[in-house]
Amino acid sequence: MESYRKLKENEGYDKSISEYVESNHSRQAATLNNYNISCDIYGGSGLEPAAQIHNEVTAEIIKRLHEQGTISKRSTLQFYDAKAGTFLNGRQVIGRCPIQGCKSEKAYADECDLGHQFEPEELIAPKSQLTGEVPELRPVDNLYFDLPAYLDFMKTYTAKLAQNPQVRSVVSKTMEEWLLPAQLYIQNKFREAFDAVEDQLPEHTVLEPEGNKSSFTVTFPSWKERDDAHAVLANGGVRFRSGKALVPFRITGNIDWGVPVPEVDGVSDVTCWCWPESLWAPISYTRTVLARDAKAAGVTEGVAAQDAALMGEPAADSTQVPAPTYQHSSLDWRDWWCSDDAQIYQFIGQDNIYFYCIAQTAMWEALGWNLTQSTVSACYHLLYMGKKASSSSQTPPPPADDLLNHYTCEQMRAHWLSLGLSEKPVSFSPKAYDTRVTGKDKDGNEVRACDDKRVIDPALKESALLTGVFNRLARSCFYGVAVKEGDESPYRNGCIPAGAASDTVVEAAQQAALAFEQAMYKFETHRALAVCDDYLRAANKRWSDASKAANKLEGEPANAAMTQALVDAFTELRVATVLMHGIVPAGCELICEYFDVDPVAFFSWDNIFASTDEFVESLGEKPGEHRVKPLPPRFDFFSKHESQY
């Protein structure tokens, strides 16, 4: 909303907010296509084909929560800009976070950019982004989910989560921080003022400061008593900061452009706040995909058919991520979300743990629909040139499409997956954008890192694996069996040679597949890529050693040795290509094309432990007779960007 407002006011943008969102969505879809990223649906909750289905899901969930007695009306305070004559939402207010110990650079109406939640009246030094004035606080009615009622459930759930090897410790530890008692932290210099009003406070206990601590702690039975204490302390001139604790989770707001909400408890003419509707948006997208399947199959009964009737068409000029060609095994969304064998995975940044691990978990429990709780993979922050990446900083990171002017999408995919954001914040520092001065030329002019040939590009760290090692192994296999005029070697028949791979090769392939799967099970993509790196380099060396040894022989021993080297190399190439497929799909699918095998069969993990002979037999062919596609001279499966030559 805020970026749209600024565009209209400062640049004369004359289109509707729906058109603005649609244009942004189209650009993002084009970027996903440029990076070879596909999905069942890339949607927007306010855009067709999902918009009307999402409205229906929103109404169903809010009505259900009300039936369960877990949402109700609360009158709370909201910022109001008297000069602009309007209520302020979200990022239209900026100030400092009131949460104890928070180091956020920016805080907004009721949350900071590190994900901390608080009441608007707690925001320190609020300022309207519309006029620069200090806004007023005026009462408004909204619906709130009773999140504190699920404190005991959340404690038990979080303790179990801490034992789950798939869930990173940053998730459970961050969740634990929100499950503490409702507390206020008051600096010692306000102790006299606090003592003067303490008898007016609701029930509480005081924890005296230990050692050299500069503040003491006041603990309340619940958030209600803590909130009641705010006015007493403020009137007494006592400044304070809040500790993290569960508080009612706001469901609605008064923003004009949003998901409509049915009237509940007399609250009407409101829309759903963006965060809660983002929690159930994946359910809406699931239902949209299944509605699309139902429509294509001519299904006329069931929820999917009803959703199909709601489903609209995307804007004619919008860019779309291509839909998959397969049909899903069940059209009932509950089979995907509520069945005993359902698995839900969500990939988020660490600053969104509160929403997707605290609020969502409690809400799913409250609905009573047997919704599967998500397995959340939370990453640390991606830095840019060593600093927090932000579009509003002095050095904002380049848009993803701009990077393709300097790097291939395969190089970027491999590099980003290698960064290890599952363990710590890591800097993305592409040399092409590095403007640091690293020296002077012979004429005394300053040389920037981006132009300095001595500076190694961190973003190309993984590129050598692709353009060097992986290319070399693939070319060696296909050129090794290519028909060659004047060469009567039995393995030069254009087919993958039959025979069992050596024990060393079989063992290495099995260990690589298992290690890769274990890393991916824990969402440790950097470790998965490291497994592939080690495996490819070892496979390339085995091929190099074996082919050189074979070339030193003559006659039948030479033919037998080279055939065995090729059997081993093709085994390793097929396994490596399957492992690397999700990392660098375009190059791997090109290798599959020259194997001349259906991609569904080639990339199926059902065949990962099969020998080459067994794999060929599964295609309905005899070992030694599967013909590969002839490889042109000097062919690259993985290429450098044209600017890198």
Stretch-by-stretch model annotation:
Residues 37, 71, 163-164, 285, ...:
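Intrinsically disordered or highly flexible coil/loop and linker segments, enriched in small
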Residues 432, 452-453, 462-467, 473-528:
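Long, amphipathic alpha-helical stalk/connector segments used for oligomerization, subunit docking
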Residues 80-83, 378-383, 421, 431-438, ...:
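A glycine-rich phosphate-binding loop feature that marks nucleotide/adenosyl-phosphate handling sites
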